């Protein structure tokens, strides 16, 4: 339910941006549900970041979301999720029905770097019985 509300909120924000062309209304951009985990989805998010005024040559905060049914699975994935600039933390998901492994860090949002993390984290989520739910980035100008 929370994911649906979050996606609806994202769509509303994108429409507001398109209508007003004001980048001040959006400070985070994330993938749409159908494109999560794909190279095309990563390209769409990077294009949205650029359209929102982000300087893609500057490091920004990125968050990758992995969900698990139980804490041991989330902890196991978190032990392998951190790589390079990324650090993993585990907490209850917002809807309290699952566990979130949040993988976060500062990096330059390049297509190659992001997609390599996406592929790795998607495989990690599947290997531990979880679900990869995409990434978001803060708009840094």
Question: Where do the PLM segments sit?
Answer:
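Long, contiguous binding/interaction regions
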Residues: 2-141
């Amino acid at each position: 339910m929370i994911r649906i509300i979050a996606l609806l909120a994202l769509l509303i924000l994108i429409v507001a941006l398109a209508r007003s062309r004001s980048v001040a209304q959006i400070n985070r951009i994330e993938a749409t549900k159908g494109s999560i985990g794909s190279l095309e989805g990563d390209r769409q998010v990077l294009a949205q970041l650029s359209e929102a005024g982000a300087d893609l040559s500057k490091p920004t905060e990125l968050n990758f979301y992995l969900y698990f049914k139980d804490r041991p699975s989330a902890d196991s994935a978190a032990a392998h999720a951190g790589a390079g600039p990324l650090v993993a933390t585990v907490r209850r998901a917002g809807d309290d029905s699952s566990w979130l492994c949040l993988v976060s860090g500062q990096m330059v949002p390049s297509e190659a770097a992001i997609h390599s993390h996406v592929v790795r984290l998607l495989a990690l989520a599947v290997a531990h019985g979880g679900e990869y739910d995409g990434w978001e980035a803060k708009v840094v100008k």
